């Protein structure tokens, strides 16, 4: 069993990337549903809900949870965008530059989220 797993990880095919995308999607589904239900229940309990109350509930009540969800979501989007570029961009230089830029943008967004999480 361990040998099969190690062989699966070491292969240079796209199967590991495919499995990571599916895992992140499955991981994101219940997290986002939880956040939506949590906010819906909270707003339903308020007599006069406002946007600030909504944002306060999301970012102050679940700040670590939001940070982790954002990182997972950004990683999932980055992987999906790379697959789209690999499949539909035909110029080699354009493909390499596009993938590089997507990775840089994803890292910058995660750095920004980290800095924001320290502030809050």
Swiss-Prot record:
Principal localisation:
mitochondrion
The cofactor binding remark recorded in the entry reads:
The heme is bound between the two transmembrane subunits.
Q: Which GO terms describe its molecular function?
A: heme binding; metal ion binding
**Binding positions (a ubiquinone):** 88
**Do you know which CDD domains this protein is assigned to?**
SQR_TypeC_SdhD_like
Q: Give a yes or no for keyword Ubl conjugation in this entry.
A: no
Keywords in alphabetical order: Electron transport, Heme, Iron, Membrane, Metal-binding, Mitochondrion, Mitochondrion inner membrane, Transmembrane, Transmembrane helix, Transport, Tricarboxylic acid cycle
The residues on the Mitochondrial intermembrane side of the membrane are 39-63
Q: Which InterPro entries match?
A: SQR/QFR_C/D, Succ_DH_anchor, SuccDH_FuR_B_TM-su
Q: Which GO terms describe its biological process?
A: tricarboxylic acid cycle
Concerning SUPFAM superfamilies, the annotation shows:
Fumarate reductase respiratory complex transmembrane subunits
Q: Which Pfam families does the record associate with it?
A: Sdh_cyt
* Binding positions (heme): 76
Q: List all topological domains (Mitochondrial matrix).
A: 1-17, 86-95
Cofactor(s) of this protein: heme
- What does the UniProt entry say about where the protein is found? Mitochondrion inner membrane
Offer a single GO CC term for the protein. Answer: mitochondrial inner membrane
Topological type in the membrane:
Multi-pass membrane protein
Keyword Cell division listed: no
Q: Which residues cross the membrane?
A: 18-38, 64-85, 96-120
The protein's job, in short, is: Membrane-anchoring subunit of succinate dehydrogenase (SDH).
Q: How does it assemble?
A: Part of an enzyme complex containing four subunits: a flavoprotein, an iron-sulfur protein, plus two membrane-anchoring proteins.
List the NCBIfam families: succ_dehyd_anc (TIGR02968)
Know the name of this protein?
A: Succinate dehydrogenase membrane anchor subunit
